Structure formats: structure tokens, C-alpha cells
Amino acid sequence: MKKLSSAAIREQFLRFFEERGHVRVPSSSLIPGNDPTLLFTNSGMVQFKDTFLGLEQRPYTRATTVQKCLRVSGKHNDLEEVGPSPRHHTFFEMLGNFSFGDYFKSEAIPMAWELLTKVFELPVERLWFTVFEGDDEVPPDDEAAQLWVAAGADPDRVLRFGRKDNFWVMADTGPCGPCSEITIYIGDDLRAMSAQGVNSDDPNYVEIWNNVFMQFERSTMQPLHRPSVDTGMGLERMAMVMQGVHSTYETDLFIPLIERQLALLGADESTYRARVAPYRAVADHSRAVAFLIADGVLPGNTGRSYVLRRILRRAVYQGRTVGFEKPFLAEIVAAVIEQMGAVYPELRERADFILETVDLEERQFLRTLSGGMSILNSVIERVRASGSTVIPGDDAFTLKDTYGFPLDLTQKIAAEHGLTVDEAGYERRMEEQRDRGRRAAQFKRAAEAEVWAGIDLPPTRFTGYAAVSGSGVVQAIVVAGDQVAEASAGQQVQIALDSTPFYAESGGQVGDTGVLIGPRGRVRVEDVQRPVPGVIVHYGVVESGSVMLHDPVDAHVDSGRRAAIMRNHTATHLLHRALRDVLGEHAAQAGSLVAPDRLRFDFTHTRPLTPEQLHEIERRVNAWIRADTPVVWQELSYQAAIEAGAIALFGEKYGDVVRMVTIGCVNGHDAPSPAALAERELAGFPMCSRELCGGTHVGRSGEIGLFRIISESSVAAGVRRIEALTGPEAEAWVDAQIATLQAVAARVGAPQTQLVERVEALIAELKQRQRALDELTARMARSNLEGLLASVQSVGDIRFLAAQVEAPNAARLREMGDWLRDKLGSGVVVLATVFDGKAQILAMATPDLAGKRIHAGNLVKALAPIVGGSGGGRPDMAQAGGRDSAKIPQALEHVAAVIAAQAGV
């Protein structure tokens, strides 16, 4: 069996299938773009899910990928297993080949055999193949079994298993089918190999590849017209097999990350071997952290953000158990970027942001740890003193709520002391807190509702659809939670009238503002709500005089603000219609904000909108505005409105009689004018919007004036958000954009029509100058290093160079060492520098000396105590660190003596 690096495995897999007609497709994000039900991308087929379901057509029928994946839940992906287990991971890479109705088993299995036995040269005598044994619903997969034998497999090595192991389903509906898994025996004694080890817990049997054959429709179990293939091979496991080791952590994917930890600690391999789990956990978690942040996830308290925070903090805690006292994780994540950046460019492109995010989160967690550990230690002592072995849920909750200690960390520390945590009690307190949170969000309004519910009032008559002014009589006054007969100047007040033109906040539309003027004084209205059904309450302050129960008042809504709100509300209806026209009827309203200065519209859609889609939506809305179509409303039964085609918002409660707002619709309540019809025909598309809505609207669409989208973003899985401006606000926004363009054009000395070309030319010029600067910097660095070659010394026949240099980081120090070692040809290089006030020493030996006469690890072990530290490493390369950077010259003077002692000269 040949030995291959992980990079070679990746490339040979992709090239093999590329040569057989497959398109090499880049990895998709860890955040699924087309599946709001999935937290993270957990297999290679996720990005092709819509293709397999027939919802999406791709320009190819064969694909091959290396997909980045994350699994952090489920029986086989318990986070606590990462580290102690030799093969569990959070982040991993999945190699795959896919057929979308192209080839099937008769081509997939021979290709798999050829790749495994001819390209990867896996020993046939160690391979096992499993197929579906069949059941009452699906026949046995005899075809796959026969194809494996025809390809060259020993019939005795083709085993049959049931649905649990060899049948794949996507969901309750959609494609499904049998799968065939390839397992390799990696034990030392072939005589101990047997069929009983396959699909068992025996670590000598490693499943390396699964070939899924989608050939049935799940709901009916009828054969698919176009069966497909989906395969998945874990790169980490394949690297383990092809590098002849028994743990994925011993492969070239993880060794550099473990070595970086040891170097930072000034420890050697024996330290790692004595306690492997924490080092492995840090290595694994660093990869997950790097890729999650690169794909846009930030640490937080919910959803994906919480998963990232949990992984990152677990890595920090594991690091502390082996001696890291200060922030270190960014250094390990930097090693991930250094190692994986060539394969996944997003790591390099976002490196600074990734490292800054990791450092900030780690420092925040260290503050949490320092505050919480003393409390937890006190709890542990108290529990032990009481003779119990269980930390109460109340204490675990306090640690989480007050000190930010996550439950899993409390459980881990408790386990280290032989204790457990009352998880049920903890969850009970958490649920109580969630209930309080839900109540707190509505506490003020709930308390007010209780007050108003105790006041016997008839429903308020709303007159605001037809007017922005009106008269009414004060029915009730509430001040500081109490019903009163009179309120005086300066008091915060809540007032109910028998009739009002003020609109109460509802359906996303904010409440009106304005004034109430009575015979005794004036009230400034700052908000309007319905604390109880049917009753409209004005919230504000008595500006002058007083207001008394039963006073007649004149109610005046801020008409300019109301007009702006109406423009934005009608615009949301036009936007909703345009979204459905452009994206599809699935684009349903999921929330909105209609304010005087802007509108916000949330809708169901799984993908970001393209610039073309946004432009088309905006074009349609503005065409409908120019058409100056009447906006009409009518009250009718709910059933009649639905039959007329009105859209009812999901989750909204409607009465028997509803208000339907219609815009356009030739057969509507008020048909468009001939001019409007001509405008619509010119625009090239009809418009008909009917929605159930109790809000206030403009009389004609032309009153909106102008509509501009200013942002489009994600709110939650499967929910997008558009923010937009209308009328004067939209005009001001456009004016600002034009002013910016004019300023930029003037600054770069180009007319606006040539601005893009000028900016592109400036960018190209900047890049050219940067390249020249980089080349100059590199030449200067080489010149400085070349100068060091003049100070090469000898001990007997061994040449060596020992020097103090300036290096910004460990990676640069190693680059300098590599260059000098190569220039030296034969000899030893010892470089020292200062990072963050601490000494760092690097030793390298050329291949002819390493492990024979010179051991770099032992060399730095001898030098490290001089600078107050420790270190170690391989025979050819080792690093050490120490607290006393002032003694670097002393350590370098000692190099000759150490070399002489090692070489015996």
C-alpha cells in the first residue's frame, strides 16, 4: 500500500473522477444555503440536495467534491468524545462523487474498486464490502454484491446487513435506496481478521467509503425514473489508513497542530503521549473554529453561534488543563489557516478577522473562568462536605446565569472531582428564566393590560381611515398604573377616548403620534397601543394644564408622519407582490416594520437575493408606483376575501369580518385608469395585490413617489429581510449616493461615466505597487539572511549558525530557518527571537545530521533553561520558549558546546 499525504489523497480522488467525466465542484459553506432545517453542512450531498430532489437542474450530471463538514450532535458525534476517542471529530472533510440520473451501480462500483485498489493501492486482502440484505419492503441488493465480485472482490468478503447499516433515506419523502460500505482491516495480524469485525466496535475495522444508490421514492418505494449516486469518503480516516497509523490524530492533518501546542508550551512528544486527549481536542476544535468563522458564524448564545462558542470555549478549557494560562488558541487557529489556506482560500482571505474573533472570545472566556472557578470550587467543597456526589441544579444555574459557565463545562469539571450535576434541576431553573424573559418582554404592557382590563369600557371607534383629526370624549385616565380622574402637567399619562383618529400599533405598523387638546390643557401623544382588545389607548405626557375624565378633546394626528407611514405601508404590499412574482409564491411575509422613515419586510426564502433579482423587484414596484393605481379597501367576510384571492398572513388571527386592501386588479373594486393600464402594459407585467390588512394606506400608488431597496440580509434560517425607503427619504438616499459618486469621481479625476474603469485602474496600480513593495521587502529580508551566512562557525566537521533575528511570528521564524538550513547545505541552524517579551528558540538540522549526530529536540532542551523555559521536538526541527529574553545571547553562546557534546567532537 502506497503512503499518501492528505493533500495527495484529496487531489488523486478529485482527478480520478474528473478524468471520468465528473465536474470538480468547490466545497459549499458550512452554513447550508438551501436547507433551513439543517444547522450545518454535514455531508457532501447537502449542496446537491435540491438537485437530487428534482428542484434544481445543474449544467452537469456528474460531480466530485471535497466538502467541509461539521457534526456536533448525535450518538456518534458527542462533543465529549472528541479528544478521548482516536477518531471522533467535529470538523472533517468528505470526499465524494455524485451522479444525478447519469450512471448507476454498474459504473459506480467498478470505479470505486479501481480507485481503491489501483490508484490508492489498498491491499485487496484487507477490504470488506457490505450490501443491503433486503426486507419485506425492498429486495436484497444482489446487483451490488455481484458487481463487487465481478470487479475482483472475494465473494466471502461481500457481507449483507439490514436497514440500520445499509439503507439510506433523506426524509419521509424523496429519494432513498440501499448503500454499500467499504471497510478496511488495519490490524497487525491478518489471521485475526473475520467477518464478525465488520460493522462492530472493533477499532481495527475502519469504514472508509459509503456508496449510496438512490433508486426508490421514499413515500411509495417505487423505483425512480432517474436513479442517482451519492458517495462519501472521510479524508481523515483515509489519511489514517494510507499513512499507516491507528488514529486520525496521528496523520499530517493534525500532527502540525499538536506540535504547535507543544512548541508554545515548550514541551516535547513525551508530554503529549502522557496525556493525548486535551491536545487532540484543541487540534480538532481549532479546525472547527477556523472554518465556522470563515463561513460567517460568530460566537453567541443561540443556534450556530452557540455551537461555535461551545466548541471554542471547550478548546480553551482543554488547553488550560495542559498548562496554557494565557490566550493561546489564536496561535493554533493560525496554524490551521497556514495548513489549510491553500485548499480553502477563504481562510487566508479572512485570516485577520478569524484570529481577532478567536482572541476576543478566548479573553472573554478567561475572564468568565477566573470569576466562576472559585465559585465552582466552593460548591464542590460544600457538596463533598455534605457527603453528596451531586452538584445541585440551582448551583449549576447560578454559575451559568451569573458567571457565564456553560453546563457542559460545569459537568466536565464536576466529573474530574467524581461528581455529577443535577441536570433536571438545572433545566427547571433555565425554563423558569425563559418564562421570566418572555414575561419581562411584555411586563410593562401586561401590567397595563391588567389595569385596563379592570376598567369597563366599550370598544373605541377608530376614525383614522378617513381623517387625521377628530373629536372624542375622555373615557379613562391611567397614571403610574392607577386609574385617576385627572392628570396634571408633567405627568406620564394613558388616555382612552370613545372615538379617535389615532392608529394603534398593529400588524407591523407603528402607532401614531400627535396631540390631544382639551378645555383645560394639552397632551402630547407619543405612542398608541391596544392593551386590551378593542380599546385604543394614547400614551403620552401632559404638556400644559390638565386633562380630566369626560373632557371633550380634539385629537390631531401628526399628519406628515402618518403620510410617511402610509407610503411605507402601501409599499410593503407592492414589495410583497413583487417578491412573489420574482421569487415564487413561497416568498410569504414573515414579519414587517412600517415606520415613518423606513420599512422592513421579512419573507420566507432560503437563498440570498441576487443583484438581478433585487433590481427586478425594485423595477416592478416603481413601475406600479408610476401607474398611480387606486388603493381601495372593503370590509367583507373572511371566507369571501380568501375566495377573492386575498393573502392572509400566517399566524395572524382574523375575525369573521376582515378588511381587504386591493391595489391594481382590473376586476377589483376600482379599476385602473386608461393611463394606468398603459403604464402597466409598458412595464410588461400586470399587477394585482390583495391582502387582509387593518393598516392605513395612501389613496393611490403614485403617492409613494419613489421606492429604493437599501439592504437585503438574512434574519434566520429560511427567512430573508429587505429594508427600503420611500418618498422623500428615498430621494434623500439617492441624492446622497449621487453626491458620493460625484465626490469620488472628483477625487480620482474621472467623469462619473468612467468611474468604474478609473477605480479598476487605480486598484490594478495599487496591486502592482504592492507587488513591487513585497518583492523589495523579500529582497531586503534575503539580504539580511545572506549577511548571517558570513557568521557560520564550525565545531569539528559540523558547521553551525547561531544568531538572534527579528521575526514577527513563529511562521516567519521557521521560514527563515528553512532558508538558512537549505543555504547551509550541511549543518545546524539555531535562531532566537522575542515574541511578546518572551524568548523563542528554533533549532534545525540538515538531513545528513538529523537523528544521526545531531538531535534538534535535545539541542533546544539544553538551551531552553538558560532563558528560563523548556522545549523539545524532532531530530530535524525543534522549538523552545522561555521567560527571560535578555539571556538569548548567553543561550546562543552555549550552542557550540551542546553541538560538540552531541556529536562527540
UniProtKB/Swiss-Prot annotation:
Its cofactor is Zn(2+). Gene3D superfamilies: 2.40.30.130, 3.10.310.40, 3.30.54.20, 6.10.250.550, Bira Bifunctional Protein, Domain 2, Threonyl-trna Synthetase, Chain A, domain 2. The keyword Ligase applies. Binds 1 zinc ion per subunit. It catalyses: tRNA(Ala) + L-alanine + ATP = L-alanyl-tRNA(Ala) + AMP + diphosphate. Zn(2+) binds at residues 569, 573, 693, 697. InterPro entries: aa-tRNA-synth_II/BPL/LPL (IPR045864), Ala-tRNA-lgiase_IIc (IPR002318), Ala-tRNA-ligase_IIc_anticod-bd (IPR018162), Ala-tRNA-synth_IIc_core (IPR018165), Ala-tRNA-synth_IIc_N (IPR018164), Ala-tRNA_ligase (IPR050058), Ala_tRNA_ligase_euk/bac (IPR023033), DHHA1_dom (IPR003156). One of its GO terms (biological process) is alanyl-tRNA aminoacylation. GO terms for cellular component: cytosol. Consists of three domains; the N-terminal catalytic domain, the editing domain and the C-terminal C-Ala domain. The editing domain removes incorrectly charged amino acids, while the C-Ala domain, along with tRNA(Ala), serves as a bridge to cooperatively bring together the editing and aminoacylation centers thus stimulating deacylation of misacylated tRNAs. Catalyzes the attachment of alanine to tRNA(Ala) in a two-step reaction: alanine is first activated by ATP to form Ala-AMP and then transferred to the acceptor end of tRNA(Ala). Also edits incorrectly charged Ser-tRNA(Ala) and Gly-tRNA(Ala) via its editing domain. This is Alanine--tRNA ligase. It comes from Roseiflexus sp. (strain RS-1).
